[in-house]
A protein has these predicted regions:
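Arg/Lys-rich, positively charged N-terminal/basic patches that mediate binding to nucleic acids
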Residues: 1-36
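Generic structural signal for secondary-structure transition and capping sites
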Residues: 20, 27, 42, 46-50, ...
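Basic/aromatic recognition patch in beta-strand/loop cores that engages polyanionic ligands
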Residues: 39, 46-82
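Enriched for short, Lys/Arg-rich terminal
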Residues: 71, 75-103
Length: 103
């Protein structure tokens, strides 16, 4: 049985902002970015538990897309088989950017 993947509005905004930036650099590159992020979502539907926990008390994990230097940061609610995407941020951004979304 697959997991349900739900993106928070902030994560959707992250994706849109990054895609817009990539499209400003090269036509169509933002669409490739979105395709790559959606591929990550598809993989998370299969088994989000493959990724290490990144928080001592919460079930927070992340996965990198294949081509772009971004992290898809998510929380796993095992008893409900739900994956909540909280942030899609550049890998170089400080952890405080996504941590405040889990408070």
């Amino acid at each position: 049985m697959n997991w349900k993947v739900v993106a928070r509005p902030q994560a959707e905004d992250d994706i849109t902002e990054a895609a817009d930036w990539y499209n400003s650099q090269s036509a169509g590159l933002g669409n490739e970015f979105i395709d790559e992020i959606l591929a990550v979502f598809d993989r998370l539907e299969l088994n989000p538990l493959l990724h290490c926990r990144r928080h001592p008390t919460k079930n927070i994990r992340w996965r990198y897309p294949e081509r772009f230097p971004y992290r898809v940061i998510f929380e796993v609610i095992e008893e409900e088989r739900v994956v909540i995407i909280a942030a899609v941020i550049h890998a170089a951004r400080h952890d405080s950017v996504w941590r405040k979304r889990f408070r």
